Amino acid sequence: MTERSTGLVSVVMPTYNSAEFIEESIQSVQAQTYRYWELILVDDCSTDDTELIVARIADLDHRIRYHRLAVNSGAAIARTKAMELAAGQYIAFLDSDDLWRPDKLARQLEFLQRTGARIVCTAYDHIDEAGTPIGRRVHKPKKHADYNDVLLSCPIGNSSVLFDAGTLGIFVVPNIRKRNDDALWLQMLKKEKYILGMSDVLMSYRVRANSISANKWSLVRYHWTLYRDIEHLSVPRSAFHIFVWGALKTLRIK
């Protein structure tokens, strides 16, 4: 296992054409009250000004590292590459359009130390493209999410997760275009029984009109790929999980 810097949090941020939002996301990392972090951005061959924006910020903050993939490969490959480059004892995920509260890392690290957990996520709210809160909706995770919980409803916000890479190592994100975050949590839960959830709202998830996850019903075939090709579930069990997932979407539970 790679030797890791004790106490360092490696923030993993895959990005693609995020020029409109990425500076605000980076600023939410720079605003953290916990100061011992590095930010690793892996660019999946952006064609907008993402690289220029990151370079300008990184020139003034050497905790920020930028890596550009040779070919456009998808978010899963970019996230895995960022984890490979990470040097920290802890790894936290942040998408390049989401935002953290200033005390996010500090409170998660305190929670890990107090509970002995190795993977933790938090509650989060929703903002629109302008950064305005959407209604009063807050997504709160389960206190203890296990493998079956993630299969049924994935009660985990990607940009809220922090885990102990010093003991768990890093993970290869399954290479599917959508729902690769769900697939990653399932990989983690084969090494750790639970992902623990904090009820504190420490992250804002940005809802974008052109997001590949905005149309929930278009995700059905990706869920099928996840269940059958990656997790190797039986046809009846896969169909059951898709039915439950669809019912939850219809009822607006998630």
Q: Can you annotate each of these PLM segments?
A:
Residues 91:
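Short aromatic/hydrophobic "clamp" motif used to bind/position activated sugar donors
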Residues 84, 136, 140-218:
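Conserved nucleotide-sugar donor-binding catalytic segment
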Residues 69-86, 107:
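Glycine-rich, basic loop-to-helix element that forms the pyrophosphate-binding segment
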Residues 20-23, 48-56, 99, 103:
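Acidic helix N-cap motif at the loop->helix transition within catalytic regions
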Residues 103-134:
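Conserved donor NDP-sugar-binding/catalytic core segment of glycosyltransferases
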Residues 7-10, 38, 183:
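Cell-envelope/extracellular polymer assembly enzymes that use nucleotide-activated donors
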Residues 28, 35, 43-52, 71, ...:
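A conserved acidic beta->alpha catalytic loop
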Residues 1-30:
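N-proximal low-complexity "stem/linker" segments adjacent to membrane-targeting elements
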